[in-house]
Amino acid sequence: MNEDNIKLLQSSTSDNVKKFSLCDKMFISKCISIYDGDSATFCIVLHNQIYKFNMRLSGIDTPEMRPLKTKPNRDLEKKASIISRNKLLQLVTDQNINLHTAYSKREIKNILNINKKLLYIKCGKFDKYGRCLVKLYNTKDHIKSFNNILVENGYAYKYYGGKKKDDFTSYFSHLNHC
């Protein structure tokens, strides 16, 4: 570390240092991992280096991969989460992905590793889990986000924080009949 950076650090206070943010920034990205229908890892170029960030699609919620064991419709939710996750995989790769297949993490990473498709993300704030909230787009003109596509086609519902829906029975049964 050079002497100028050391002096900068020594003079730092909570009042004179900005908090790191990606808010309102647009990036070209590549999806390298998908956890569920609204959570994935993307690579972006920042300061001439490639970084990976865990990101969550903003404004939506999808079924959980690991719902609480006490949930009455747990098995239905797990099946619906696979369908939602695979729909996101289909969107980010432009590949014919079987929505009902329970792909392993390794299989998903292999699909994403060979995929060369680049996506556009518009960043928001970081959530309570440290994930950057993003709108995900196919093109840089960001006409229609994947977030909205997932909602419009029944793979997600609108969600802006706070208490989540308790009863998803009709939502899950719709997904399980896709």
Label the predicted regions.
Residues 1-178:
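Small beta-barrel nucleic-acid-binding modules, primarily SNase/OB-fold domains
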